[in-house]
From Swiss-Prot:
Belongs to the archaeal IMP cyclohydrolase family. One of its GO terms (molecular function) is IMP cyclohydrolase activity. The keyword Signal does not apply. Pathway: Purine metabolism; IMP biosynthesis via de novo pathway; IMP from 5-formamido-1-(5-phospho-D-ribosyl)imidazole-4-carboxamide: step 1/1. This is IMP cyclohydrolase. Keywords: Hydrolase, Purine biosynthesis. The keyword Hydrolase applies. The lineage of its organism: Archaea, Methanobacteriati, Methanobacteriota, Stenosarchaea group, Halobacteria. GO terms for biological process: 'de novo' IMP biosynthetic process.
């Protein structure tokens, strides 16, 4: 099954995976306390605005994760004191689904004292608080559903397992978590760009 890009949001940990048929030459890099999806050196040049973006960023003491440029305004709104749910809803509504050939949904999640997952599609906006690991993807599973991946344990293993989930066309994955006491713990991220 082809899910496209997907997130799994848990209470203290989140996963992001890029799966792609159109732009497989991408990787996740760490820079300036963010995780960013960028083309690899082998990638053909493109002016497609949906190929490179921050997929993880800290907002206040929360972790914001998503499949595009909406990650930045969500984190910025949280930094300004917005409640997590409102920051997620406002940014998704403002930026809407991607205006590509597939009307690709935007997906995002927030990990913190209250964790949320959201999606904006051409036909719906869904924002949910979560209490168990929850998956939402750009294709097929485009409504929040219980994830089939445990988010407990070693963060490096979680990133690799996310990459290895049996969904088609994996490109790269990352996992991020709060280590320590709840939201006040350090944020630790792990990238897995394939073998």
């Amino acid at each position: 099954m082809y899910l496209g890009r997907f997130i799994i949001i848990g209470e203290t940990t989140a996963v992001y995976r890029v799966s792609s048929r159109s732009y497989p030459n991408r990787q996740i890099i760490s820079r300036d306390n963010m995780l960013t999806v960028v083309p690899t050196s082998e990638a053909a040049q493109t002016n497609n605005p949906y190929v490179s973006y921050n997929c993880m960023r800290q907002g206040g003491e929360k972790i914001v994760i998503g499949n595009g440029s909406h990650v930045d305004p969500i984190a910025e709104k949280i930094d300004r004191g917005y409640p997590a749910r409102d920051a997620l809803a406002e940014a998704l509504l403002a930026l809407d689904y991607e205006k590509d050939d597939y009307n690709t949904p935007r997906i995002a999640g927030i990990v913190g004292s209250s964790s949320y997952v959201g999606i904006i599609r051409q036909d719906a906006v869904i924002i949910r608080s979560i209490s168990e690991p929850t998956l939402v993807s750009t294709y097929e599973n485009d409504a929040p559903t219980t994830a089939q991946l445990s988010l407990k344990g070693d963060i490096e293993e979680i990133a690799q397992k996310a990459y290895e989930l049996e969904y088609e066309h994996p490109v790269c994955a990352a996992a991020v978590t709060h280590q320590g006491q709840g939201e006040s713990g350090d944020i630790v991220a792990q990238i897995y760009n394939g073998k």
